[in-house]
Amino acid sequence: MTKKEIIILCGPTASGKSYLGHEFAKAYNGEIVNIDSMQVYKEISIITASPPKSYTAEVTYHLYNFLSITEDFSVVKYLKLATEKIKEITARGKLPILIGGTGLYINSLVFGYNNIPDISEDLREQVRNLHTEIGNIGLWNKLEELDTLAASKINQNDTQRLIRAYEVFLQTGKSIFSFQTLPKEQILSDFNFKIIFLNPERKFLYKTCDERLDKIFKEGAIDEIALIKKQFIPQDYSNLKAVGVKEILAYLDGNLTLDEALSAAQIRTRHYAKRQVTWFKKQIEDKTTLEYSNQEEFAQILNVIPAWH
């Protein structure tokens, strides 16, 4: 039986994924599925550059801005939802097009994942409260007492991985890294993945990063984060790690001017984009890479869309 096709359009932030994916979906009767870990949250749709209404009016989009930032989400939960959407799309005779830059989600969909048991909500809250009380160093010390392997591999400043490792050990009695030795579960083995990697020339990428942040700041991101601040959500909350959030919070707290906040967010975005490019180059081997160094070359990519499908 011929395998059904899935298009994955990936690459660094501000590389043009959303635009190209939207045009591809219009041309080939596609529906778009989010594969970005931050664009699932409805309260931060502006700062994460989620698809505008002009896009969603033309093409069906899935798994964007449907969760509250106060809700826990994981790669396993994402995979379950994404798999359901992909199968629904193909059942309608349409083409699933996945757009995003979260490497863990992409890697798990394509190559399988290590099935770590779900963490109970009570335990999550317990660990979160403990972290608020003792901070990263205190939690890392507790992790080291229980799981020296995880402690040796996780930086004390990596809040999300630190909390995750501690939760997993308390829930299972095993190191989170012990699950990585188990065979990976394949969830979409009856599909054929076509991976398109957008790789802009670095100077051009940094320019688009800066321009997008400037646009986002001017088009409502300040008010968006101010509203979250009023909800008294902890500023180190893992679901608020989208680039620009902490810089705007610093501005709202009076610790940075608006120009300083924008500049800091732009610098962090460029660093993030660089890490994404490195990851995709190293981790995804079977892919089509599209390179461009200016807006004119980017526009020409539309001419090669027929070769994708």
Curated annotation (Swiss-Prot):
Amino acids binding ATP: 11-18
Domain of life, source organism: Bacteria
A GO molecular-function annotation: tRNA dimethylallyltransferase activity
Catalyzed reaction equations: adenosine(37) in tRNA + dimethylallyl diphosphate = N(6)-dimethylallyladenosine(37) in tRNA + diphosphate
Sites marked Interaction with substrate tRNA: 102, 124
One GO process term, biological-process aspect: tRNA modification
Keyword Protein biosynthesis listed: no
Location of region: Interaction with substrate tRNA: 36-39, 160-164
EC id: 2.5.1.75
Assembly information from the UniProt record: Monomer.
Cross-referenced NCBIfam families: miaA
Protein name, entry field: tRNA dimethylallyltransferase
Organism this protein belongs to: Rickettsia felis (strain ATCC VR-1525 / URRWXCal2) (Rickettsia azadi)
